């Protein structure tokens, strides 16, 4: 009986987690979370190759597309090739894509290894970073409830426009994102 209850609780938890993955209906939550922030929080962390990174990473690019994702999220994994194409395109304009795999916060080596394998399989090689879950940036990443979620950050670390909630494979989402990117690059 005890095993059955544990199994049912696990199944319910997974069902709730996967129902949030790619859910566009909860976009209001993101407007609230990101609207309260003027800039991406300061952080110190590492990329998936072990290189030290901090918020100055944004100063290296005219615009940075920051994508929040996790390994078990199908829409997140499905959009990795699209994000790689965006990264290639943005690099020509002085921009970049950076991934934040929320499962890898605190540097969980198993999750990072699995994420790297997923990215390799999907043909994605853009930079992914992690930092302490208890940092302000970690708290922001942990507040994301629907995945994937994508935001734009300018070279001063300011969050630009509204977050794009859900996969970028649809025309509407890409058009919205491209409009925001063009607006920043035009300034």
Regions found by a protein language model. Give the residues of each.
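N-proximal helix/coil linker or "cap" segments that precede and/or mark the start of modular domains
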Residues: 21-42, 59-60, 116-117
């Amino acid at each position: 009986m005890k095993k059955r209850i544990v199994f049912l609780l696990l199944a319910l938890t997974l069902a709730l987690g996967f129902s949030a993955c790619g859910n566009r209906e909860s976009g209001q939550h993101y407007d609230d979370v990101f609207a309260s922030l003027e800039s991406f929080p300061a952080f110190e962390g590492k990329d998936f190759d072990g290189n030290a990174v901090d918020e100055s990473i944004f100063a290296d690019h005219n615009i940075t597309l920051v994508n929040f994702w996790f390994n078990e999220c199908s829409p997140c994994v499905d959009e990795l090739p699209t994000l790689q194409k965006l990264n290639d395109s943005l690099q020509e304009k002085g921009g970049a894509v950076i991934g934040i795999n929320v499962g890898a916060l605190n540097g969980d080596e198993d999750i990072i290894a699995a994420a790297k394998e997923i990215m390799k399989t999907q043909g994605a090689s853009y930079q992914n970073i992690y930092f302490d879950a208890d940092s302000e940036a970690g708290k922001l990443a942990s507040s994301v409830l629907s995945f994937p979620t994508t935001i734009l950050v300018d070279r001063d670390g300011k969050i630009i426009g509204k977050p794009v909630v859900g996969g970028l494979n649809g025309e509407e989402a890409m058009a919205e994102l491209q409009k925001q990117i063009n607006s920043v690059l035009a300034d």
